[in-house]
Amino acid sequence: MPSALAIFTCRPNSHPFQERHVYLDEPIKIGRSVARCRPAQNNATFDCKVLSRNHALVWFDHKTGKFYLQDTKSSNGTFINSQRLSRGSEESPPCEILSGDIIQFGVDVTENTRKVTHGCIVSTIKLFLPDGMEARLRSDVIHAPLPSPVDKVAANTPSMYSQELFQLSQYLQEALHREQMLEQKLATLQRLLAITQEASDTSWQALIDEDRLLSRLEVMGNQLQACSKNQTEDSLRKELIALQEDKHNYETTAKESLRRVLQEKIEVVRKLSEVERSLSNTEDECTHLKEMNERTQEELRELANKYNGAVNEIKDLSDKLKVAEGKQEEIQQKGQAEKKELQHKIDEMEEKEQELQAKIEALQADNDFTNERLTALQEHLLSKSGGDCTFIHQFIECQKKLIVEGHLTKVVEETKLAKENQARAKESDLSDTLSPSKEKSSDDTTDAQMDEQDLNESLAKVSLLKALLEEERKAYRNQVEESSKQIQVLQAQLQRLHMDIENLREEKDNEITSTRDELLSARDEILLLHQAAEKAASERDTDIASLQEELKKVRAELERWRKAASEYEKEVTSLQSSFQLRCQQCEDQQKEEATRLQGELEKLRKEWNVLETECHSLKKENVLLSSELQRQEKELHNSQKQSLELTSDLSILQMTRKELENQMGSLKEQHLRDSADLKILLSKAENQAKDVQKEYEKTQTVLSELKLKFEMTEQEKQSITDELKQCKDNLKLLQEKGNNNKPWPWMPMLAALVAVTAIVLYVPGLARASP
């Protein structure tokens, strides 16, 4: 199964190392090289002094497909893109790393003794998945410039949708980075302080050891001197050696007690400095938390203001949207009203056109029907009469004309009321004139029928009826003449009617042409209206489309703003809740910390008072010790010089020691030889001691006598001193008198006499006291 690969590439500001290709089949340890594990190209062990042995762990999680890095309680820390994973000597949670991240192990450390700077490991990491593809880059992750620690191997990738929140996170990260740098500086200062304390302790220990060595050398020198003396008594030699050893033990115990006292004082001063530092750190943390609280409150206020601004913008946009919707509705209503008006006009024109067409069709149908009736009547009359049909034709034509005229008058009635009245008057006149002819025609038809009946019934009476027929013919001729006259009159009337009909036709034609022109103009208007309606509809459609697009845009923008507002609300609520929780936690922590700190403060105050008193005393002692230290430094300098001299003396002493050892060998032989002599001498010495004892008793008696003499001389001396004082007083009085008067020439002689008497009195006493 293929495994994931991590490549560590050295950067210019790093401690130099070869490029490492590490396969992450299992969690890989990153650390300092030791005897068991040496640096190689396939491991993460580096030859660098600032790394810990078990500095960090790196591994690949097959479930999530992500790479993780964990700091394992390293002393100098692990950094991803200049962000420390944990505080000093604390284990960090697993943190996701991406390809292209800058990984730093440890920090640069400078040695004060040799002034050498040890560099840290800074590398660019490239990560490859088991399938050979490179892992995600940091630039591909949106708004996640720095990795964040995860709990239980789950990447906590922040999802930021706002530039302000991103800047806020950047500011927080920069503040954390500055805090980490300050912590590192404090750690380095603490380390330097510890180093200086260790250096002072070592220097003090060296001073004490050197003093011990000097005292030991002095003791050895004294012992050497004691041994080099040709003493005859071993007891005196042993006693001197014991006294020197006692002196050395006393000095060592005194110096040890002094060192212990100084160490206790230094420990107290160190504890005091630690307490002061912890107090200053807690105060700094309190001020930092207060500043963070104020900053977060200001940021929340800014977010609230921005949210209110966004809400106001949303309200303005909603108002604009409502105004646009109102305008669109007005435009739609206007378009609908115009469309309805145009449609109504079109419908009216179409109805008028249909009515005119219906009227024309009705007139045409009536005309056809009347023509059919007239043709039928003509045929019937022709079949019945078979005679002169001119009158009938004229009558039919007249009837046709009358029918046409009636139809035309009907049309004129519908079009114009005035012409309708005239047409009705003319029709009434025509009906009056045609009524006798109609009656006669009806009588003729009845006579024809009667004739047919007579012809059918009585053919025999033909001859009789011929005479009657002739008479009737005469009468009929008369009637025909009368009817011809009437026809002429009717023809004249018909001509007049023709003229009127022609005029009416012309008027009708004019009206028809005018109506047709009106229809054409109406059609043109309808077309124009259709075109205008289409244009208006197209414009309205375009306006509606543009308005709909704008409406969609506005709605989309409104929806976006609403989503943004909802997201802002969610973020604000989450931030408020988290901030409230954080504030509550901070308040609880601050309360607990405050109570704890108050208790500690009270303790510290008590300790401070105690320590202050001790500090004053220690300061005084420190001044004394500093002066003593300066003196001892001077002595140390002198002792160093003396030590150099003593080293030379030691070499000489070693030479002399060798010689003395040789001499001791010879002395032992002499001692063995002299032991017998010493025994003899010892017996002699015992005898001499007895003699000395006797002499001692004698001297004791002499001493008692001398003491008595001394007391007597002391009394004499006291009396002489009193006399001398009196003489001095008298001399002063005499000098004062001499200053007032002329000096006496015998005064020096008197002073010399007094001095001589004092000497005479004082010297014998001394001579007696001296034996």
Curated annotation (Swiss-Prot):
Q: Which keywords are on file for this protein?
A: Cell membrane, Coiled coil, Cytoplasm, Cytoskeleton, Endoplasmic reticulum, Membrane, Mitochondrion, Phosphoprotein, Transmembrane, Transmembrane helix
Taxonomy, superkingdom: Eukaryota
Cellular compartment(s): Cell membrane, Sarcolemma; Cytoplasm, Myofibril, Sarcomere, M line; Cytoplasm, Myofibril, Sarcomere, Z line; Cytoplasm, Cytoskeleton, Microtubule organizing center, Centrosome
Q: Does the keyword Zinc-finger apply?
A: no
Identify the main location.
membrane
Q: Provide a Gene Ontology MF annotation, just one.
A: protein-macromolecule adaptor activity
Membrane topology annotation: Single-pass type IV membrane protein
Task: Kindly give the PROSITE patterns that the UniProt entry links to this protein.
Answer: FHA_DOMAIN
The UniProt entry's coiled-coil ranges are: 167-202, 230-381, 452-742
Transmembrane feature ranges? 746-766
Pfam (any one): FHA
State which tissues express it: Expressed in heart (at protein level). Expressed in heart, skeletal muscle, smooth muscle, kidney, spleen, pancreas and brain.
| Residues where Phosphoserine is found | S148, S431, S435
Q: How does it assemble?
A: Homodimer. Interacts with myosin. Interacts with SIKE1 and both associate with the STRIPAK core complex composed of PP2A catalytic and scaffolding subunits, the striatins (PP2A regulatory subunits), the striatin-associated proteins MOB4, STRIP1 and STRIP2, PDCD10 and members of the STE20 kinases, such as STK24 and STK26. Interacts (via FHA domain) with STK3 (when phosphorylated); the interaction associates STK3 with the STRIPAK complex.
Concerning its family, UniProt says:
Belongs to the SLMAP family.
Record-given protein name: Sarcolemmal membrane-associated protein
Organism of derivation: Oryctolagus cuniculus (Rabbit)
Q: Which gene encodes it?
A: SLMAP
